[in-house]
Amino acid sequence: MAIRRATQAEANYIVQLSGKVMKESSMGYAENGVQNAYNLFMPIIQNGGYFLIDIENGRVRGWILLATDWNAVKGQVMGNLLSAYVFPKFRRSGVALDLATAAINELKALGIRTIQINVFDGNPSRILCEKLGFKPVSTVMELDIQ
């Protein structure tokens, strides 16, 4: 197993894959769609964000997108963990923990003091986030009006 920064070609491939798992990773909130993934993640990558990938025997087992951004509320640059995904075959094997830890360490090396992650309601990855020390800070609520 190796965790490393994705190449440009791998990042494009992962964005395409992300479009195919959006519904699952958002607990049904977002529809699958490669174009949706490009619209969501390419601006982040163009602004300096990048994927870390877990790769074994030439096969991607999972990924996490990390980025930094100015947070006006906190008055500081903060890290963001986005688009974390592990293929079902590799879940419960430590891949997600290894990816998240590597991403946290990379952000820490950049001098980032606070990291945020968005976890959709009902997503079991919330347990891992809490294990890593993440705490809820807000709840996004939504009302559909017809």
For each of these PLM feature ranges, what is it?
Residues 2-16:
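A short beta-loop-alpha structural element at the N-terminal edge
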Residues 42-53, 62, 80:
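A short helix-loop-beta-strand connector motif used in the catalytic cores of GNAT acetyltransferases and
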Residues 64-73:
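A conserved beta-strand-loop-helix scaffold within acyl/acetyltransferase catalytic domains
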Residues 75-88, 142:
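Conserved acetyl-CoA binding element of GNAT-fold acetyltransferases
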Residues 83-86, 92-105, 131:
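Conserved acetyl-CoA-binding loop-helix of GNAT-fold acetyltransferases
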Residues 107-120:
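Conserved GNAT acetyl-CoA-binding A-motif
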